[in-house]
Amino acid sequence: PCGEIVTSNDNANRKTVFERLPDIDGKWINIGRLDLETSGLLLFTNNGDIANKMMHPSSNISRKYEVIIKGSFNDIKKEQCIKGLDIGMSETGKFDSISACKLTANKYIVTLKTGKNREVRRVFRSVGCTVIKLKRIQYDNIKLNNLLVGEYRYLTEKEIKLLSIPFEN
């Protein structure tokens, strides 16, 4: 949920997403992060190898976001976002795809395969747009679907088999 930090131990004593998870033998490991202003799908595991494989850039795993922006966005800017832009700190950010939602103005579905810090926000900022709302709706083949804010569930066997990385039980 927005306003909850994705860390298991916060020195500033802020609310963390880990407080919502059940107790397990071992520890929960987050697969990726969301910033404080972003909501949506987070995956957790107790297997460090799985977490590392799913987050490593060489795994080429896609993440899909629903984004509402403020500012003018046209085909030229869309092309720039797909080709890649300087997003500061000597980094290039780019989207693998971007499509407009037909029913809502300034709402887009963005897919990318890199997980740079605040990359979606930084790419849109590079073309003069501000992200108003950002929600991760998919990570690899796992979709958020109708899961409510703050809820969790375990992956099904079918979902585990759909993961892009080899997985052994």
Task: Give the predicted meaning of each segment.
Residues 1-169:
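Basic, flexible Lys/Arg- and Gly-enriched helix-loop patches that mediate nucleic-acid binding at interfaces
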